[in-house]
Amino acid sequence: MAKRVFFSFHYQDVIDFRVNVVRNHWVTKLNQSAAGVFDASLWEDAKKTSDIALKRLINGGLNNTSVTCVLIGSQTFNRRWVRYEIMKSIEKGNKIIGIHINAFKDKYGNIKSKGPNPFDYLGYQYSSDGKQLHLYEWTGGKWEEYKDLAPYRVNQIAPESLRGKFYSLSSVYRVYDWVADDGYNKFSSWVN
């Protein structure tokens, strides 16, 4: 069954057409359902919008989605709003995956080396009572509390074994390579 997927990406990768390869791979299949995806992402370039308006735009884009797919290019890890989309997806309870997209040619025929994994730069920690989740980001050579989304109460108290421990998102969420892992044929299984 097809999932409503929110794609998170750096806008430069749209300009280079790498994002479009993944988001539009369904057009050569029978339909979006056969590809396993209904795209619920934001196409707008909202660079001139306030922080509050951008958060509202992202939050609205995440509504009615069950999966967040982070398309990893060269600078994705460093983008403030990609980080927000990931952290908000955790709060929402979406399944989260990453996909490296630098292994196929851009519109100029160039291939790039893999970009840094954004999940290496984000993390979380359950409170000692297991009732709250605190979010962190790697910045300035150290882990700091994430400022764009406050700690929040979790729906279900965390098991004692998870309380008070820090987890990098890369230890929790899977990352694939669109080319090496055959994303064209396997994407629907990744999001299910």
UniProtKB/Swiss-Prot annotation:
Presence of keyword Hydrolase: yes
Pfam families: ThsB_TIR (PF08937)
GO CC aspect terms: cytoplasm
Any one Gene Ontology molecular-function term assigned to this protein's record: hydrolase activity
Coiled-coil portions: none
Subcellular location: Cytoplasm
BP terms from Gene Ontology: defense response to virus
Regulation (activators, inhibitors): Activated upon phage infection.
Gene3D superfamilies: 3.40.50.11200
Keyword Cell inner membrane set for record: no
InterPro entries: ThsB__TIR-like_domain, ThsB_TIR-like_sf
Enzyme Commission code(s) on record: 3.2.2.-
Domain of life: Bacteria
Keywords, comma-separated and alphabetical: Antiviral defense, Cytoplasm, Hydrolase, NAD
Class of enzymatic activity (EC top level): hydrolase
Outcome of gene disruption: When this gene is missing the Thoeris system does not confer phage resistance in B.subtilis.
Domain notes: Has an N-terminal TIR domain and an C-terminal antiparallel beta-sheet.
Role summary: TIR-like domain-containing component of the Thoeris antiviral defense system, composed of ThsA and ThsB. Expression of ThsA and ThsB in B.subtilis (strain BEST7003) confers resistance to phages SBSphiC, SBSphiJ and SPO1. Phage infection activates this protein so that 30 to 45 minutes post-infection with phage SPO1 it generates a signal molecule that in turn activates the NAD(+) hydrolase activity of ThsA. The signal is similar to cyclic ADP-D-ribose, but how it differs is unknown.
Family indicated by similarity: Belongs to the Thoeris B TIR-like family.
Subunit composition and interactions: Monomer; not seen to interact with ThsA.
Protein name: Putative cyclic ADP-D-ribose synthase ThsB1
Species name: Bacillus cereus (strain MSX-D12)
